[in-house]
Amino acid sequence: MRRQAAAEQSGDRSPHSKKVASYKTAFLQGLRMTTNRSKCASTVFIAVILSGAAVPHVSRVGAQTSQTASITIDASKVENRISPLLYGQFLEFMYQGIKGGLNAELIRNRSFEEAPNIAGLSRYWERYPDDRNDDYALAFHWDDASAYPPQRPKVDTGERAMKEHSPRVDARDGAIQRHGLYQARIPIRAGLEYRGYLWLRADDYKGAITVALESDVKQGEVYASADINVIAGDWRKYEFTLRPEHSDPLAQFVILFPGRGRLWLDQVSLLPGEAMPGGVRRDVFEKIKALKPAFIRWPGGNVAQDYRWLWGVGPRDERFTWVNLSWKNELEPSDFGTDEFILFSRAVGAEPSITVNVEGRGATVEEAAAWVEYCNGPRTSKYGAMRAANGHPMPFGVKFWEVGNEIWGDWVRGHSDADTYARNYNRYARAMRAVDPSIKLIAVGDNNMNWNRTVLRAAGENIDYLAIHHYYGRREMAGDPLNLMARPLFLERFYAQVEQLLREIVPGERIKLAINEWGLDLPDERQYSLESALYGARLMNVFERSGNLVEMSAVSDLVNGWPGGIIQANRQGLFVSPIYLVNQLYSEHRGDKRLAASISSPTFDTSREGSDVPYLDAVASRTADGRKIFIKAVNTSPTSALTTTITVQGVIAGSQAEIETVTAPSLTASNDFARPDAVFIKNKAARSGRSFVVTLPKHSVSVITLAVR
């Protein structure tokens, strides 16, 4: 996952004219909601702005005294198909993208591998009841001589093996009778069942232990508890159920040691009974399912070049905790592995798309082929038998496989030049297809056409999709917010260049694009504002206009990871970004065929992304059965609504339209945990017909649905 935009810039590099400066000032004023300035300017034929035959026609209009626009749709003319795979999503092991965000596991650092504090307790664990008084009768030691499981299969990364740890507990008779350890900030709900377990090895410990959910504020207030009788001997799993009587977003999970003697503790787990397939949080699961993702890409991203898939299969408590080299060496549990990812993806209605590690951190072509066999091989094969032993006798049938991630970037393990990558790609493709010839392979592309040219010439015959990633942000905008509003149109021209390259090197329209990472590098309040949604919607309109080439896309990221995550989930709740809202609307109203459309709109100029850029961006599509037409209209003006005349030719439209609009009182309004609906979707009905007028609010994204007779 590249956290910077493509190096290319476009448009006029000359100094600002007074006209450009005035438009930039107006946009900034619009951001601050201190002006009602409107601009009346001429539009130009959109081919000058966008180029290529796949874009709508915009006619020239004269100077205007009010902000008006028009959209004319020819429903009898289909410009291109729109792929059913177009709107997918992207998950990565990145901070709390998986752990704490997607995953329902409530215990952090449940295998005690994080470094300990002075008391000998690993990260997130504290001494109970607290540190007010000396508890001379209870001692902890972060022990690397005993841990569960005692042995794991070796996965060679070329790195020094990480020692496994568990806390050794010595409990004696003392003044503080109710003592142990705890984790804070556990969100619980009254009446919901919480299923947990832990592993214990008891030496000479005599007595029981107690697990409980308690109040952190009112010490001693117990919501639910269970006693566990400890059996002396080697490692043993103890299960328990807790059903709290009260809700508390900041409860404690407590493990108490009323007995006497020595024991070891490891692999503690606490899951809400409502956890969804793959062990996913219910609230996050429901938000993802509402997006109707066509596919979900995993495990990365940059981290795909670190990840070794064997870490994340097999019994949950026997999996590895691994160091995430891509993201500040965070330790990652392997609770969410291949099986969980596929179960989760299918449960939300998405096809899994797996990115294999190419030569990073000791990865090999044999390992990639083995992963395909684990997912798709018969149970009689070596790795198919492993899958069956893990509870899944039938093949998963994973269709989409990406061969490496951003290999051109020196921030990933396995980085190489294009020639080396192409040779490696061919080796991996042959080995993976030898296991399952039906799989679709995605190769690493770039915004650099020289990279694409080299890879396509050497490996084009083995490629189904070329993955290209787009990031854009503060550095590229150079202080001009209008650059952000225009940037997607540069990418539309870029896709035309890629299409021409494909025709030259790999003719036949066989290879398609997967824009399976796109995002913005903006401060978080702007990431979660309407401004970002306008950029996202215009870019997604570009995807639909480029439907002959672009078949897959995914915003970066789906859950947390960085401010671009469109679902931001903490332990107590979540909110969604305006880009999430756009994704939801566009996925629900994808359409199967894009219709010819011409647009008349006022325009603006930018400092880097060209001039005479239309404020209005629109795409029209229809469903396969022809009974509905969707019009996706983005008004990027920061200050003016657009009174828009819509004319539909070639069909008879119904008398009423449904309009769903992503909007907010101001361009700077942003969603957060305190104000999760500052930017929202507004629904209304409007009169429609062969020709009708709608008002597209300033800085808004609207989807207009027409019934067709």
Where are the predicted features?
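Glycine-biased, low-complexity coil/linker segments
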Residues: 1-2, 11, 15, 40
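Extracellular and organelle-lumenal recognition/adhesion modules and their flexible linkers in secreted
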Residues: 64-334, 351-355, 363, 369, ...
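Aromatic/acidic polysaccharide-binding cleft in carbohydrate-active enzymes
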Residues: 93-94, 480, 511-617, 627
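Carbohydrate-binding surface patches
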Residues: 227, 612-653, 659, 702-705
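Aromatic- and acid-rich polysaccharide-binding/catalytic face
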Residues: 266, 394-413, 452-491, 511, ...
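Glycoside hydrolase catalytic-domain groove-lining segments
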Residues: 326, 330-334, 340, 427-430, ...
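Aromatic-lined carbohydrate-recognition surfaces of secreted/lumenal glycan-active proteins
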Residues: 357, 387-388, 429-450, 495-521, ...
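Substrate-binding cleft/loops of secretory-pathway carbohydrate-active enzymes
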Residues: 363, 367-372, 446-471, 518-532, ...
